Amino acid sequence: MEQAWRWYGPKDPVSLSDIRQAGATGIVTALHHIPNGEIWRIEEIKKRKTEIENAGLSWSVVESVPVHEEIKTQTGNYQKWINNYKQTLRNLAQCGIDTVCYNFMPVLDWTRTDLAYELPDGSKALRFDHIAFAAFELHILKRPDAEKAYSQEEQVAARTYYDKMSEQDITQLTRNIIAGLPGAEEGYTLDEFQTQLDRYKDISSEKFRTHLAYFLNEIVPVAQEVGIKMAIHPDDPPRPILGLPRIVSTIEDMQWFVETQPLPANGFTMCTGSYGVRSDNDLVKMTEQFADRIYFAHLRSTQREDNPLTFHEAAHLEGDVDMFNMVKALLNEEYRRLNQGETRLIPMRPDHGHQMLDDLRKKTNPGYSAIGRLKGLAEFRGLEMALKKVYFNK
């Protein structure tokens, strides 16, 4: 696999030099300074690509070209944003970039309630507390009809949780959920957030699928034409939240996805941490079934807690994900491609490392501090080497 690393551009506290020292060769990044929906101009792409290459690295994957909210709701200028998206793909291809990760999650890209959950060893992780999230929905946001999403027992637990919160706790939880996490292109005030949610009140999962299908049927033929692999990222967490439709969460969703737009350019980002939150997702089976459509991998693990809807980010080789067999399945597919004459390795990045050691004293992007990902990348490198020697005679 190609060892890659997510970089948030020149303002990222982790420098390109740091990344190269970590042993990565590929960069996963985006033009975060360009507003959602606007065309990525060739000169802007080339500028960022040259910056990366001057550091001895390559721009391996775009993560992400954001999908404008009006595309997701099919309102306003959605056709304009789709046409802009097509031109961005053409421009990326002209600059030699061949893989684009994106998501179709409404309003929020990914959601956590705690960005500094302290583990027993003193390191810090990201966490999603189901009851804390319920307290936010029911008593802070006060989303209409939110109680329908929770059992009576959960509502009581959420009320108890909320009653113990200080004003600072409320502010922090709200900020964690709606202010935008790394990689998210939108942040909101509480009122703006509810306004965004209201845009989806009449959009069921079935209707939302028709919106995704329309997007795919517009975009994927262009990607196929110019030689770009589109790799959709799963919902995070992979279940309905905030009354919003979530349609990239299960193996059934993956099957619908490839049947809806069967061109080879239409593929997946296998994010083990996102899919792995659900105990009914068999990650190895999902990887094997859709192996030829996996164009990018995010490798991380999560640990479900006593409440199975609550989870935290585990160490990369621990937690609920069978990382040994996951990496083995990815290598099986990679060697199949190589044996058929393909030369492109599957780009993989260690995702959401723990904040640890010296990084505990630094300002870092939540989930994207250097040392935790350095540790994860080294572990994956060792696991890959062992698997190759034992199973692939390499």
Curated annotation (Swiss-Prot):
Identify the cofactor(s): Fe(2+); Mn(2+)
Report whether Transcription regulation shows up as a keyword of the record. no
The annotated pathway is: Carbohydrate metabolism; pentose and glucuronate interconversion
Statement: the UniProt record of this protein carries the keyword ATP-binding: no
Q: What keywords does the record list, in alphabetical order?
A: Iron, Lyase, Manganese
Task: Name the reaction it catalyses.
Answer: D-mannonate = 2-dehydro-3-deoxy-D-gluconate + H2O
Q: Which Pfam families does the protein's record reference?
A: UxuA
Report any one BP term from Gene Ontology: D-glucuronate catabolic process
Q: Which GO terms describe its molecular function?
A: ferrous iron binding; manganese ion binding; mannonate dehydratase activity
Name the top EC class. Answer: lyase
Q: Which family does it belong to?
A: Belongs to the mannonate dehydratase family.
The free-text function statement in the UniProt record for this protein reads: Catalyzes the dehydration of D-mannonate.
Protein's recorded name? Mannonate dehydratase
What organism does the record attribute this protein to? Haemophilus influenzae (strain PittGG)
Organism ancestry: Bacteria, Pseudomonadati, Pseudomonadota, Gammaproteobacteria, Pasteurellales
The gene name reads uxuA
